[in-house]
């Protein structure tokens, strides 16, 4: 356990940030899962709608630094490609 006041404060800050980041990552995964489920059920309209909702969430998560911008770009690219396979 930390003994210095500043170290104790840092631990508290890190716990708060960790919880916030975990929540954002979990939300992100949920939106990505919705797109994949819509594609698996072969529902093009639902897949496109889910993708349009997921893309801003992915971008915002990258902007906040929770995931790397290349990771976000790759996710958007792969999901778009997946939705486009429905024709």
UniProtKB/Swiss-Prot annotation:
Q: Which family does it belong to?
A: Belongs to the bacterial ribosomal protein bS20 family.
GO CC annotation, single: cytosol
- Biased composition regions of type Basic residues, renumbered to the chain: 1-11
Q: Which UniProt keywords apply?
A: Ribonucleoprotein, Ribosomal protein, RNA-binding, rRNA-binding
GO term, biological process aspect, one: translation
- Record function comment: Binds directly to 16S ribosomal RNA.
A GO MF annotation of the entry reads: structural constituent of ribosome
Q: Which residues cross the membrane?
A: none
The protein's name: Small ribosomal subunit protein bS20
A Pfam family that the UniProt record links to this protein: Ribosomal_S20p
Lineage top rank: taxon: Bacteria
| Keyword Ribosomal protein included in the entry's annotation | yes
| Chain segments carrying region Disordered | 1-26
Ribosomal protein listed as a keyword: yes
